[in-house]
Design a protein with these regions (language model features):
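A contiguous, low-structure linker/loop signature
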Residues: 1-28, 40-42
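Catalytic cores of large soluble enzymes that bind and process phosphate-bearing ligands
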Residues: 18, 22, 144, 218
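Conserved alpha-helical scaffold segments that buttress catalytic/binding sites
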Residues: 31, 35, 46-201, 230-234
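Alpha-helix N-cap/loop-to-helix initiation residues
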Residues: 149, 218-219
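Metal-dependent catalytic neighborhoods of phosphoester/phosphodiester hydrolases
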Residues: 183-186, 219-224
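A short helix->loop->beta-strand "cap" motif at the edges of active sites that frequently abuts
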Residues: 204-209
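C-terminal helix-to-coil terminal segments
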Residues: 221-240
């Protein structure tokens, strides 16, 4: 048990008889979506569960065992010189940031609740911009508790601008639905309509895209926001 604890960042990743099967299937969904884009699809979505963005290379945490978005980005790198991971889960993706913090081939940008009094607490601050070769390839835009639709959407637009400025050739969207005001873990005040608008905004980005599902803990909210996001995203991607 002590050895297992060395590779666990918190108490949120219990391991049972079926854990590995679920974790592996979730990661393989991300692999399949990324392979579809590598082979020529303009977009693909991985309905991952459990989520992944709190998982480090060698550590589970925050309900996450394998980092699905990072795995997808690795697959995309077989075709694209630089990939951007853009994360709008209400929690900062500390695992994703750590994996790519010293690298310039994957840009990571995150919009999330200010971590000063919110999980993951020790990462997600605006002054974390990357290190060494990865300097300026990490962007954190923390939002104060109670933040609503307009600042949330504006911050996502800033992520997109930064990813394009970094010359990303493909995008992984870490799509967390838990910023919704009805989510039991949310401290933000984001509405269902904001996710609809986000779908349109991300759909306008002229890059091959993999959507990887992250968090979301209100089934009622997910039933509203995920279809709205995906529908608007796909509508924008249709040839005019």
């Amino acid at each position: 048990i002590a050895h297992a604890g060395w590779y666990a960042g918190d108490m949120a990743c219990a391991i049972g008889a079926g854990t590995w099967d679920g974790v592996y299937a979730s990661a393989q969904a991300a692999v399949a979506a990324a392979k579809a884009v590598v082979e020529g699809a303009e977009e693909a979505m991985a309905l991952c569960r459990p989520p992944g963005h709190h998982a480090y290379q060698d550590r589970s945490s925050g309900f996450c065992f394998l980092n699905n978005a990072a795995i997808a980005a690795g697959v995309l790198r077989s075709r694209f010189k630089r990939v951007a991971i853009l994360d709008f889960d209400t929690h900062h993706g500390d695992g994703t940031q750590a994996i790519f913090y010293r690298r310039s081939d994957v840009f990571y940008g995150s919009v999330h609740t200010d971590p000063r009094n919110y999980y993951p607490y020790y990462a997600g601050y605006a002054d974390e911009t990357g290190f060494g070769e990865g300097d300026k390839f990490n962007l954190n835009l923390p939002l104060a508790p109670g933040t609503g639709d307009e600042p949330f959407i504006d911050a996502n637009q800033k992520l997109i601008v930064a990813a394009l400025a970094a010359e990303a050739e493909a995008i992984v969207i870490s799509a967390g639905w838990d910023a919704h005001f009805d989510d039991p873990l949310s401290k933000l005040a984001v509405t269902s309509d904001a996710y609809r608008r986000l779908g349109r905004i991300y759909g306008e980005v002229p890059l091959p895209t993999v959507i990887v599902q992250e968090g979301g803990y209100s089934l009622a909210a997910i039933e509203e926001v995920a279809p709205r996001f995906v529908s608007e995203f796909l509508d924008e991607r249709q040839p005019s």
